Amino acid sequence: MFRFGSGKRGRHEIVMTEGPLLPRILAFSGPLILTGILQLLYNAADVIVVGNYAGHEALAAVSSTGSLINLLVNVFMGLGVGASVAIARNYGARDVKAMRKAEHTAMTLALFMGIAVGAFGFAMARPLLRMMDSPPDVIDGAALYVRIYFLGMPANMLYNFGAAVMRAVGDTKRPMVYLMISGLVNVLLNLLLVIVFHMDVAGVAIATVASQVVSMVLVLLCLFRTRGVTQLNLRECRIDRRSLREIIRIGLPAGLQGSLFSVSNVLIQSSVNSFGSLVVAGNGVASNIEGFVYTAMNAQHQACMTFASQNYGAGKPDRVKRTLWCCLGVVTAIGLGMGLLIWLFGKPLMGLYNPEEQVIANGMIRMAVIMPTYFLCGLMDVMVGQLRGVGYSIMPMIVSLTGACLLRIVWILTVFAQAHDLTVLYLSYPVSWFVTFAIHFLCYMLIAQKKINQLKPV
């Protein structure tokens, strides 16, 4: 029978409900940052190999698929957020039975969703890319990439849900190691398939899917072999209705929010597509570089959500509130520091991906708007993490969809439609981040804090 010992945790787990808060948040988020940066380095290797050995059309084909993939995947990945919150809260409350039911429900759900999403994405790739007005010289390669990518969706889902289980109990180091291994597989296959066998877009997609399978196998082996409350058991893999309701209550709004965010990003990508393949390539490279800042900031979002959830389950209101302020401070420092540094060295960084001067110039237009203001995105995400961590799901979804998604769409249909200028298009990002953060902060101070103050120790 699984049980918590006398306050002892596994050697890979971080105790979130006791001890100094900031060092433990940094210990939790540090491996997440390294994991995300490693993943982006491997993704960057994809883009660098394609950009230098297959030309800007192949680069545009790979770069232009991100918003479509996110649109199809985010609603289901949001359920992974719900699973992480449910597991973390039960872990903080030391309710082993409920925690294990949530874990096995989540992993069963991941398998079914991976198969369903993979089939849909494979079948609908080309029609959806047509709806996005993909340039004629890009759409064939983009459709091929999306189809191959979605063949690996079951592995992608199982890895992400398995990693969410591990993060919920404070284990962020082992997923980092597994990603290092799978990422190395990705890079080696990229070099082999693109440079040696000249498979271009197909080679990049196959390498990506292969690396996802490797990471899935490593995470599943870890969960099956671990000794403790998170051990995975095939005989327990079933859908528990109560756990499913809790996962859906938190995760579905998060997933809908992510997908509807992607709707606005698809609209932005469609607007970028109207400028031609050189602008699409520059936008894709700049976006790829921005990802290094985003992944570091997103680690604070995950830390805030997990720490708030565990301490909420443990009935510790002061630690819940201090979690927010620690994460807001850290994410501001990361966003401003990394954003300004990358903007300063933007041209040589862009040149690593593609040497064409016009591609670099187009990418720098995006960087000049996004990089100095990117910390606002981090502040917005930390507020969302705090609200989800204490059990609010509908509120952050409505605020985010209104303040970010809807505002961006209105901006594109009005301000950008009048100017048809890249800088004006990109300004929709910082404006929406600031408005959404401000509304989230007001909701937290006026509504959520009352709920937190009523907590009683478990």
State the predicted function of each range.
Residues 1-29, 87-152, 196-252, 308-373, ...:
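Short alpha-helical transmembrane segments in multi-pass integral membrane proteins
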Residues 37, 41-60, 129-136, 192-199, ...:
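Helix-terminus/linker motif at the lipid-water interface of multi-pass membrane proteins
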Residues 18, 22-41, 45, 68-75, ...:
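Residue-level signal for short hydrophobic patches within transmembrane helices
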Residues 27-46, 148, 159, 182, ...:
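Transmembrane helical elements of multi-pass membrane transporters/channels
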Residues 71-74, 186-190, 216-220, 292-295, ...:
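Hydrophobic transmembrane alpha-helices of multi-pass small-molecule transporters
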Residues 59-119, 156-175, 269, 282-346, ...:
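Small-residue-rich hydrophobic transmembrane alpha-helices
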Residues 32, 36, 48, 85, ...:
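Transmembrane alpha-helix boundary and packing residues in multipass membrane permease domains
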Residues 80, 148-167, 175-186, 204-219, ...:
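Short runs within selected transmembrane alpha-helices of multi-pass transporters and secretion channels
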